[in-house]
């Protein structure tokens, strides 16, 4: 069965900021068990993929395609604690997020990939000083850019 799903790169940016914030809060609390510190690198790209369930006895869901390989490349060439996005994602995200150009990075047997760090939401779209939580202005701009209201954003705005 084939179907098309259109999650937006802006959603991926918001999810990445949330993950980054969660890891930062965990690290700031300290670790009473003295386990190794958790480091997180996030790479984001967007494009067509093929998905499916594989396996005969033990089933697993997986995705394949150039977009998956480029997202993996973005993550592999990221620094710990940062979010690395492709030029395509940056084009979708630049209106709402602060981006830091990194320049092109050569990929083996492929073209160079232009990369950007996604640092935070722009201050006018953020409800916190760190730029991790969207505000109501963000919700209106998101709706204008994507043509749909952000999923569960209104609930997120009301929670601490």
Each model region followed by its residue ranges:
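Catalytic/regulatory signature loops of cyclic-dinucleotide turnover enzymes
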Residues: 27, 45-46, 66-87
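Polar/charged alpha-helical tracts
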Residues: 24, 63, 140-144
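Catalytic core of nucleotidyl cyclases, primarily class III adenylyl/guanylyl cyclases
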Residues: 1-11, 25-66, 92-96, 114-116
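Amphipathic alpha-helical segments that line or abut small-molecule/effector binding pockets
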Residues: 10-21
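Cytosolic regulatory/linker segments at or just downstream of nucleotide-handling modules
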Residues: 49-51, 77-160
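Solvent-exposed, flexible loop/coil residues
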Residues: 53-58, 63-68, 72, 103, ...
């Amino acid at each position: 069965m084939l179907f098309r799903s259109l999650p937006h790169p802006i959603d991926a940016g918001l999810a990445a900021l949330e993950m980054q914030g969660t890891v930062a809060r965990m690290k700031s609390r300290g670790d009473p068990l003295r386990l190794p510190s958790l480091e997180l690198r996030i790479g984001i790209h967007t494009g067509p993929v093929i998905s499916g369930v594989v396996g005969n006895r033990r089933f697993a869901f997986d995705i394949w395609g150039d977009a998956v390989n480029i997202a993996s490349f973005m993550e592999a060439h990221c620094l710990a604690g940062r979010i690395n996005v492709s030029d395509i994602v940056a084009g979708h995200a630049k209106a709402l997020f602060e981006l830091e150009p990194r320049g092109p990075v050569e990929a083996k047997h492929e073209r160079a990939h232009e990369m950007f760090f996604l640092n935070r939401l722009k201050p006018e779209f953020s409800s916190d000083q760190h730029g991790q939580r969207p505000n109501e202005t963000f919700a209106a701009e998101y709706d204008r850019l994507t043509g749909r209201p952000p999923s569960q954003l209104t609930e997120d705005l009301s929670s601490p």
